[in-house]
Amino acid sequence: DSEEVATVARGFGAEVMMTDPACPSGTARMASVMDRLDGDFFLNVQGDEPFIAPDLLDALISRWKETGCPLVTAVSRIGDAGRLLATSVVKVVRAENGEAIYFSRSPVPHLRGVDPSEWTARRDYWAHVGVYGYDRATLAAYPRLGATELEAAESLEQLRFLAHGMTFQTVVTGYHPVAIDTPEDLEAARKMV
């Protein structure tokens, strides 16, 4: 929905599909243009995650093929309390089979009676990596599902799928997101390139 981004992308040869600025999320944008694209599976790399490695995208495609789960996403281990407590880092609670149970900006699960500074030493916590894979039918259903209270409360688009009974399979990656969510993140990213 940004002409500035579209101009830069066209400048390096990317094919650009503009979306309605009223689209509330990347998933809504993907759903709005999917009819112009061929394919059974769609990858959505969030705009604030510019350093996603191609092998992670390959791993998501493989997980989709292996499991048949219509939704896949990636997670990485959170190693420190600072990231765990940051609301800009989306946390993922995973089931034993790798399915995502919940996404939250809060540190979940809560370890009762343990100081939060010790939580990452006591159990694994997972950060969401801003990339999704959807099969065609599931992505097409997204706008019809309607927004949910959970999605609005956390401001996380993926909660719409969970609230409607759909599941995400997760891929664990050693990639640690370099998301650009704050001015400080942008400054750090500029130093990387």
Language-model features: where?
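Short, high-confidence coil segments that cap the C-terminus of an alpha-helix
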Residues: G39, T67-C69, M166
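Short phosphate-binding loop-to-helix
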Residues: E3-S62
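Conserved core of the sugar-phosphate nucleotidyltransferase
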Residues: I52-L145
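Short, surface-exposed amphipathic charged segments that create phosphate/polyanion-binding patches used
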Residues: A31-D35, T87-V90, E187
